[in-house]
């Protein structure tokens, strides 16, 4: 398998991208094509043992800056890592593209270079959003911000197929993200989309879902929103999870220190006891005071792992005629490795062909 990685993309490139590519190549034995500034990539590769690994480097002399307009940058900078990488996929020289760089440029480039699946008006990003009961698929999480109701219905159709074929949910429950469960809640986009989704016999539409229901009740397997709202929910969720784990961690540390200090006096008293009794009393006293805080560490670590975006690596861009994974801009080596793993899974599961074939059997909603 041949995966193209934007080695110059991301806040921690090329250190994180090169390290992640090496880990992926060593784990799965795939060819990882590193596209970007050749000199910096090779300098980073030289720091690692890459023997028996297939890691070709393709030079991309142009860099798309985060301040640039995505569509204009893709058109002007044909020798950027994003443009070159996507052309490799389009031309059949690679199977998938992964980037933690300019997400807007990646999405615009995928749309211009790979093109859309026949009948699809706009692409969408699908994110595995953590919930109490597991995960819900949130789409769109940032690809198309200015939407028509017909776009959201197509997002629901693609999410339905993705959930069935990739996540193995036989009858995915589709929910429309809104500020209330009632059909008349939301802005005009949400209300008009609600009417269209109710008319779809190919979808198990359960109605509007509020963000709290998505997180706690697990009422929907697929949650549909326009890219602006979906991206806000995603980033707000990241902030909330970070706040919870950070606050809990700080409280545990403070409690542990307080109990340890309170345990010093009985410990000193224990040392005055005769024989082995002093050591038993000392251990029992300190353990009793520090154990409650220590016991909270394991659940906290489990929560952090469950909420960690690095475990999924990135978000697949659905609706384009090729596999493109948009990774988090702050991706470290582990996140890059998992994004590559997500790309190879999409290749193995034939995501594009599966969605395209499945949508041929249902009536797509054309844009008005």
Swiss-Prot record:
Cross-referenced InterPro entries: FA_synthesis, Phospholipid_synth_PlsX-like
Record carries keyword Cytoplasm: yes
GO biological process, one term: phospholipid biosynthetic process
Annotated keywords: Cytoplasm, Lipid biosynthesis, Lipid metabolism, Phospholipid biosynthesis, Phospholipid metabolism, Transferase
SUPFAM superfamilies for the chain: Isocitrate/Isopropylmalate dehydrogenase-like (SSF53659)
Keyword Transferase part of the UniProt annotation: yes
GO-annotated cellular components: cytoplasm
Intracellular or extracellular location(s): Cytoplasm
EC number(s) reported in the record: 2.3.1.274
Pathway entry: Lipid metabolism; phospholipid metabolism
Main location: cytoplasm
Catalytic activity: a fatty acyl-[ACP] + phosphate = an acyl phosphate + holo-[ACP]
Pfam family, one: FA_synthesis
GO molecular function: phosphate:acyl-[acyl carrier protein] acyltransferase activity
Subunit structure: Homodimer. Probably interacts with PlsY.
Family: Belongs to the PlsX family.
Primary role: Catalyzes the reversible formation of acyl-phosphate (acyl-PO(4)) from acyl-[acyl-carrier-protein] (acyl-ACP). This enzyme utilizes acyl-ACP as fatty acyl donor, but not acyl-CoA.
Name the UniProt record assigns to this protein: Phosphate acyltransferase
Native organism taxonomy: Bacteria, Bacillati, Chloroflexota, Chloroflexia, Herpetosiphonales
């Amino acid at each position: 398998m041949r995966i193209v990685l934007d080695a110059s993309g991301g806040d921690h490139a090329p250190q994180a991208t090169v390290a992640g590519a090496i880990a992926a190549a060593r784990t799965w034995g795939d060819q990882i094509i590193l596209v970007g500034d050749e000199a910096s990539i090779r300098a980073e590769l030289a720091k690692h043992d890459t023997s028996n690994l297939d890691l070709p480097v393709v030079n991309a002399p142009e860099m798309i800056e985060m301040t640039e307009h995505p569509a204009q940058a893709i058109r002007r900078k044909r020798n950027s890592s994003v443009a070159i990488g996507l052309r490799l996929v389009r031309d059949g020289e690679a199977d998938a593209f992964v980037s933690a760089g300019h997400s807007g440029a990646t999405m615009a480039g995928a749309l211009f270079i790979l093109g859309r699946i026949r009948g699809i008006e706009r692409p969408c990003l699908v994110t595995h959003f953590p919930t109490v009961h597991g995960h819900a698929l949130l789409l769109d999480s940032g690809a198309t911000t200015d939407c028509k109701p017909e776009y959201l219905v197509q997002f629901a159709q693609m999410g339905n197929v993705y959930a069935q074929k990739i996540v193995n949910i036989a009858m995915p429950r589709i929910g429309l993200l809104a500020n209330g469960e009632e059909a008349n809640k939301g802005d005009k986009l949400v209300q008009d989309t609600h009417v269209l989704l109710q008319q779809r016999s190919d979808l198990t539409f359960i109605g509007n879902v509020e963000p709290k229901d998505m997180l706690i009740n697990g009422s929907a397997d697929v949650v549909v929103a326009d890219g602006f709202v979906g991206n806000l929910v995603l980033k707000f969720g990241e902030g909330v999870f970070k706040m919870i784990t950070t606050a809990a961690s700080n409280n545990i540390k403070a409690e542990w220190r307080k109990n340890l200090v309170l345990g010093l006096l009985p410990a000193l008293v224990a040392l005055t006891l005769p024989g082995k009794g002093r050591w038993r009393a000392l251990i029992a006293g300190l353990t009793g005071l520090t154990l409650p805080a220590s016991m909270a560490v394991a659940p906290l670590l489990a929560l952090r792992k469950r909420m960690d975006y690095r475990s999924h690596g990135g978000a697949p861009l659905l609706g384009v005629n090729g596999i493109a994974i948009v990774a988090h801009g702050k991706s470290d080596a582990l996140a890059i490795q998992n994004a590559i793993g997500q790309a190879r899974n999409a290749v193995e599961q034939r995501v594009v062909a599966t969605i395209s074939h499945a949508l041929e059997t249902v009536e797509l909603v054309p844009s008005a």
